[in-house]
Amino acid sequence: MMAALDKHYQGEVQPIQLMQAQMSTEAFQGFLRGNIIKYVSRLGKKDAPTKETAKILQYAVWLHQSVKGEELTL
């Protein structure tokens, strides 16, 4: 999704993957939920709504994958 489109997400290991590997599941899912809340609460106030909703969707997909016990897709 969003990560595949942006040039700065082209490194070998992404920070989000490192976080998933090193954090407890509860902490990692809390981080993802917090980012969803952040982007929902500022929708239309910072970046274009389409950019912010893309971020919301990305974090929601990652949360869904984490809940299912999967590694994140980028």
List the model feature ranges, each with a label.
Residues M1-L74:
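Intrinsically disordered, low-complexity regulatory regions
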